[in-house]
Structures are given as structure tokens and as C-alpha cells.
UniProtKB/Swiss-Prot annotation:
Disulfide bonds: 54-65, 104-112, 114-132, 180-194, 182-189, 256-294, 272-287, 291-333, 309-324, 311-321, 316-317
Task of the protein: Ligand for members of the frizzled family of seven transmembrane receptors. May play an important role in the development and differentiation of certain forebrain structures, notably the hippocampus.
Similarity section: Belongs to the Wnt family.
Organism the protein comes from: Homo sapiens
Keyword Glycoprotein assigned: yes
Tissue expression pattern: Expression is restricted to the brain, and more specifically to the forebrain.
Signal sequence, renumbered to the chain: 1-22
Compartments in which it is found: Secreted, Extracellular space, Extracellular matrix
Protein name: Protein Wnt-8b
GO BP term (any one): response to estradiol
């Protein structure tokens, strides 16, 4: 007997977002509608890319996308309804849609190909739609059925999660790139044909990180929705907010501090960055953000690293390298005595 679609989706996504890297889709999707099983590996890969992007975007934040945050299932994991939960839902939804769209364009699915629905139509002054646009409509439709099926409730929390799932999909569509090819005599560009391509997924992650910082707090009772009137009020409230924006119901906790009840480790012991030509402003200020503003000192530790260097190709056919040792300095947040005049942590500061 086949499982119902929602049951299959819930099984799939709950298992995909476990942090063990040894999972296999085939282990938990042995049955189900065959029409949807063909997408399961793409959904798994998309969910994993969302996890990795979350960790990248928040690597130097007080909340750094910890393992317990990476389950979308309401059966345990994301108990809070704060802006971090909003981001996890959005980036996971975006990752699934992005991967399905990309794999469609690569020809991985027999029932999907380029989006040429607008080919030949005037797109703007001097250019027409043409070529092979990535089929985001397909990726959006399939990912919506997989991801949104996790939400079986009708309360404010479920509405929030569905809204942020949609914001993730909108982020993929909103960051698509227009690529054009010139046509004309002797290399002139009299007219152009253009198509839409997916950006690097890193751009989608950066876009959603900006939305995270601007996330809107919705003032609703989370238990609302048990009555027709309550559900109507929730629906009206969320309809008034653009689906391009992230929303949350609760304020974030103080991520500086350890909180075993919430599963928060605090920032003590976290590594931070101070120097490096390639560092951006956010990374260079990580010691202040993770340590100083949390009432911790910055501890300097020296370590020796070993890496391959002076590699040479020898005919035929081997590459031989030397092992070079290098002393490096790393910085960590420590409970050690702070220098005089250091700022004390102020609870409730923005994470």
C-alpha cells in the first residue's frame, strides 16, 4: 500500500534534515507515489544545500545555525518561532526549489526541461525572450508540495512557517539572472535574445540573510487558530505582509549565554577572526560581536599547522609535495579576566 503524499513528504523531509551525513533517501522512502519518488534525491540534496548555506551565512554570528535548529518537522527541533527559525525555513525551502530547478535544466527528469513559454515575445527595448530559461516554475511547484506538506496545523506558527517557506521560494525567483546573446550583421548587437538563469546559491543565501535582519515581527497569539474566527484573523494578518519578507512571532533569546533548556551553547569557546586581507567587515568584527559584546575576553592561541607546499609534477605521472609547517594565531572567546575598561555584556542585544 502506498503512503499518502503528505505522509511521504513528512517522512522525507524529517529524515533529510537530520544532521547525520550517512542518511540515504532510499532508507526511508521505500514506498510512495512513483511520480514523486523520482524527485526524492533532488529534494534531499536541496535540503542539504540549505543546511550548508545556513552554516555559512551565520558562521560568525552568535547564533551559528546549530545542529538542533536544522529540523523543520514540528515533531521536535524548531520549538521557537523567532527570526532564526524563519531563516531556516526560508533557506531550506529555497535549497529544495533551487536544486529541483537546476536538475530539471540538466535533464535529470524526463517530464521537465527548459522554460521556453515566453520565447519570441518582446521582453524590453531591443531584446526578445529566447534560449533556454531555467524552469523555476517546475522547481517551485514540486518543492512547494514537498516542503509545505510538513505544516499540518492551522495556528499562527504554521502560518508563519508557510509564509517563510514561500519567502524562500521568492528569493530564488528574485535573484534569477538575465543572460543575453547579441544578433546582428558583423557582430553588431541589433537585437538580443535573453533567458533567465539561476544565480549561485550563495547569492540566494545572502539575499535571505538580508531579509533575516529585516524580518517583521507579527503580534499574534500562537494558540490562535482553534476557531474559525481565529484562523480567519491569522490568514488576514499574513495576507497583508509581502511574501518576500521573513516573519517571526517571538523575540530571539540572548545567544551570548548558555541556556540548556533552549539548547543554546552560548559564545564562550567560540573562535573569532581579527586579521586577514580577505576578511569582510562582518568577519573582522566577529571578536567584538562574539566575545566583547557578550562580556568575554579574547584569548589568543598559537598553533602549528602542516600543509602540502612546493608541489612539483614528475613525469610520469605523479605530483610530489613537501610538508610545510606554519605557525598561526587563532582567537577564541574566553571567560578569562577582561582588560580594564572592557564593555560588559548587555542582555537582550540584537544577536
Amino acid at each position: 500500500m502506498f503512503l499518502s503524499k503528505p505522509s511521504v513528504y513528512i517522512c522525507l523531509f524529517t529524515c533529510v534534515l537530520q544532521l547525520s551525513h550517512s542518511w540515504s533517501v532510499n532508507n526511508f522512502l521505500m514506498t510512495g507515489p512513483k511520480a514523486y519518488l523520482i524527485y526524492s534525491s533532488s529534494v534531499a540534496a536541496g535540503a542539504q544545500s540549505g543546511i550548508e548555506e545556513c552554516k555559512y551565512q551565520f558562521a560568525w554570528d552568535r547564533w551559528n545555525c546549530p545542529e538542533r535548529a536544522l529540523q523543520l518537522s514540528s515533531h521536535g527541533g524548531l520549538r521557537s518561532a523567532n527570526r532564526e527559525t524563519a531563516f531556516v525555513h526560508a533557506i531550506s525551502s529555497a535549497g529544495v526549489m533551487y536544486t529541483l530547478t537546476r536538475n530539471c535544466s540538466l535533464g535529470d527528469f524526463d517530464n521537465c526541461g527548459c522554460d521556453d513559454s515566453r520565447n519570441g515575445q518582446l521582453g524590453g527595448q531591443g531584446w526578445l525572450w529566447g534560449g533556454c530559461s531555467d524552469n523555476v516554475g517546475f522547481g517551485e511547484a514540486i518543492s512547494k508540495q514537498f516542503v509545505d506538506a510538513l505544516e499540518t496545523g492551522q495556528d499562527a506558527r504554521a502560518a508563519m512557517n508557510l509564509h517563510n517557506n514561500e519567502a524562500g521560494r521568492k528569493a530564488v525567483k528574485g535573484t534569477m539572472k538575465r543572460t543575453c546573446k547579441c544578433h546582428g550583421v558583423s557582430g553588431s548587437c541589433t537585437t538580443q535574445t535573453c533567458w533567465l538563469q539561476l544565480p549561485e546559491f550563495r547569492e540566494v543565501g545572502a539575499h535571505l540573510k538580508e531579509k533575516y535582519h529585516a524580518a517583521l515581527k507579527v503580534d499574534l497569539l500562537q494558540g490562535a487558530g482553534n476557531s474559525a474566527a481565529g484562523r480567519g484573523a491569522i490568514a488576514d494578518t499574513f495576507r497583508s505582509i509581502s511574501t518576500r519578507e521573513l516573519v517571526h512571532l517571538e523575540d530571539s533569546p540572548d545567544y551570548c549565554l548558555e541556556n540548556k533548556t533552549l539548547g543554546l551553547l552560548g559564545t564562550e569557546g567560540r573562535e573569532c577572526l581579527r586579521r586577514g586581507r580577505a576578511l569582510g567587515r562582518w568577519e573582522r568584527r566577529s571578536c567584538r560581536r562574539l566575545c566583547g559584546d557578550c562580556g568575554l575576553a579574547v584569548e589568543e592561541r598559537r598553533a602549528e599547522t602542516v600543509s602540502s607546499c612546493n608541489c612539483k609534477f614528475h613525469w610520469c605521472c605523479a605530483v610530489r609535495c613537501e610538508q610545510c609547517r606554519r605557525r598561526v594565531t587563532k582567537y577564541f572567546c574566553s571567560r578569562a579576566e577582561r582588560p580594564r575598561g572592557g564593555a560588559a555584556h548587555k542582555p537582550g542585544r540584537k544577536p
